[in-house]
Amino acid sequence: MNARVEQLEFQAEARQLLDLMVHSVYSNKDSFLRELISNASDALDKLRLEAFRNKDLDVDTSDLHIQIEVDKDARTLTIRDNGIGMTRAEVVDLIGTLAKSGTAELRQQLREAKNAQNEAASEELIGQFGIGFYSSFMVADKVELLTRKAGESEATKWESSGEGTYTIESVENAPQGTSVTLHLKPEDTEDELHDYTSEFKIKSLVKKYSDFIAWPIRMEVERRTPATEEGGEETVTREVETLNSMKALWARPKDEVSEEEYKEFYKHIAHAWDDPLEVIAMKAEGTFEYQALLFIPSHAPFDLFNRDAHTGIQLYVKRVFIMGDCDQLMPEYLRFVKGVVDAQDMSLNVSREILQQDRQIKAIRRRLTKKVLSTIKELQSERLDDYRTFWTQFGRVVKEGLLSDFDNQETLVQLCSFASTHSEEEATTLAQYVERMKEGQTQIFYATGETRQQILKSPHLEAFKAKGYEVLLLTDPVDEVWVGTVTEFDGKPLQSIAKGEVDLSAEGEESQAERDEQQKEFADLLAWLKDTLSDHVKEVRLSNRLTDSPACLITDAFGITPALARLYRASGQDIPVGKRILELNPKHPLVTGLRQAHQDRADDPSVAETAELLYGTALLAEGGALDDPARFAEILADRLARTL
């Protein structure tokens, strides 16, 4: 075998995806053409930009286009572009393997979608992971790719039948750009495999999926001219026809663009297979002129929380593509928004570094952000089901904005929804919470934890449930952080049920005299426990938030909770956790029994061991981790043995 010809195996994840394509049961196999045309369009965008920025690049950009060629006899379909092209290494990296991030999650989600025979979910995944090239194997039993990078002399030929391996070789005398040739599977109407050598079929697919592509999509078509004389024969000629209108959707009035056109454009720029949840069309005139077409997706991408994930906004200047992931146009907490911004008064030679300082970009970003947030607000007030879909998919990300976007913090707080003890199914806004507050209640109560069930079983919640106070249940990691930034809503302070002191005695169950008497009765025990547990706690006091549990651990009003400390440590910041406060339920048998035992035999080691067990159970009840699990287990086993 030629030294420059190799047979390689696909990466494991790629083989699984290929298997899904080859044995596809999708009804919508037509969409493979959209994916290949989108890839070709991207290649042309990149070449034009590179040629503008690199004056030494010797390429002809006067006739950039996409060519579709069919061969009915050979049953092949070729999509060709004269764009940027790829090197051999890029072919292996982009086609032989999947993107470096998210491969494990892709493997798991593909398996689940395939096992459930969930066509919609599987199609969505393909677009989500940006691997539409593989969809060629839905309709082809062999795929050939020929590509030459602009400015390079050597070309690369890639070929695979989708069975786990591919061949790659270096070739000479290839045109600049990329061509993908599909050796089509036999037509099968039952399996939705159409005749993709049909001129009518190809034209209809281009019109449906890719009419808005900015580059001409050309194909040689047949023209029939009727006979001019009776008894004569019709004349058949062939000519090249441009199949798409090439109209920029964002430049057209919204009332002239159909819903279907918006959907297909979204799928093109977002590499998505599902429909957007909402379309936002904007046009600004005046100091800064720009047009924007933005989309709120209906599903979160797999890499939503990946720091290296690309943002979804494309920047154009006077309809010339500048960059595909312009993170300066949208705040990070709105990174899920997809779309296009076309500015009129910027230099084509703009760079990311320049954008960071550009006054116009900052102004556009502010306006886009406010428009997206106002659109979400409209969903919340007018289309509640769509808002709930949005919040389920993107709520965790939006809450990040509470920590970073102080200009819009008030709006963001109003947009947020939270689980609460009021309802198992329905989330609540803070405004709705305030409307339901009990008479005399002055604070908005909340609890943080890993899951709803964990919080509901927390000792901290007992008195709040018993007295009918609604508590917000915050289970996202970001919740631990933003509650330290947003301290009040509508004049009502936010109060953690596990921090500081809370007064729930407004109903007058106990008089102050009774509480003073309890304090006197337990004073010796509290002082002894503080000394005995001094390695773990800074204070021991009686609690009015416990009804069933013997004890719970509390953090100072302005202290860092253990969960927040874990979050900081996970991000590389070593935050020390201060000692906490142990609160006791003065009516619990264990606490009253411990008080009596301390009075009777304070020097008995078993009494001190009981104090350790009391502290350990409080720690475990809130989902914490014991400092010395073996010691705790030893004491507990000894106590259990004595009961037998």
From Swiss-Prot:
Q: Which GO terms describe its cellular component?
A: cytoplasm
Keyword hit for Cytoplasm: yes
Q: Where is the signal peptide?
A: none
Instruction: Tell me the PANTHER family matching this sequence.
Output: HEAT SHOCK PROTEIN 90 FAMILY MEMBER (PTHR11528)
Annotated function: Molecular chaperone. Has ATPase activity.
Per the record, the similarity remark reads: Belongs to the heat shock protein 90 family.
| Stored NCBIfam families | PRK05218.1
Specify the protein name: Chaperone protein HtpG
